[in-house]
Regions:
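Gram-negative and organellar
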Residues: 1-187
């Protein structure tokens, strides 16, 4: 499997920026004796994104994004679909932490019916994703360990609620994550 993508942004005045992107993916399933249908899910995907960021003030920024993706699988039934995404986020750059809150919706429309689940019915799902992330520089807590404040701890919570026209695809998930990241300059 592989994925390629490109994107960029441009500013409009001092408080607005527009971002855009394209990604291509070619995913390959690992077909073996325990998964004899993996080859059928091999898919080519194209996705496009467009976003707008706005600086409200030194503390608050907002972002709105739209996306479209099209996935075409080797075997169509239940694997070919289009996704339409829309999300809104608000970010707070507090002196003590960076907090990002985002709420988004994804609409999935499948192109052919999956006969293994429901004959003749085209699957259609909507998923609501809410997440909150808190980021803090380790150097703010332990200056001796990270004097440049380039090592971060990230805590996040995500809730996904999906509803489909086929009951098998309704679900609610909650997830928490803890991660560490480091920033550096290449010049």
């Amino acid at each position: 499997s592989f994925m390629y993508g490109a994107g960029s942004f441009f500013s409009i005045g001092e408080r607005n920026s527009i971002s855009y992107g394209y990604a291509f993916s070619d995913s390959k399933g690992n077909q073996n004796s325990t998964d004899t249908t993996a080859d059928e899910t091999n898919a080519i995907g194209h996705s496009f994104t467009l976003g707008h960021d706005f600086i409200v003030n030194e503390l608050i920024t907002t972002n709105i994004s739209l996306g479209f993706s099209d996935t075409d699988a080797k075997i169509d039934a239940g694997n070919d679909y289009e996704t339409y995404d829309a999300s809104f986020g608000i970010n707070f750059a507090f002196p003590w932490a960076y907090i990002a809150v985002t709420n988004g919706y994804s609409f999935n429309d499948y192109k052919k019916a999956d006969s293994s689940v429901s004959t003749g019915r085209l699957r259609s799902d909507v998923a609501n994703t809410f997440d909150i992330m808190v980021t803090k520089a380790i150097g703010d807590i332990f200056p001796a360990i990270d004097p440049n404040r380039s090592f971060f701890i990230n805590l996040s919570y995500e809730k996904i609620q999906s509803e489909g026209n086929i009951l098998n695809y309704d679900y609610i998930t909650d997830s928490f994550s803890l991660s560490f990241s480091r920033s550096f300059n290449l010049n």
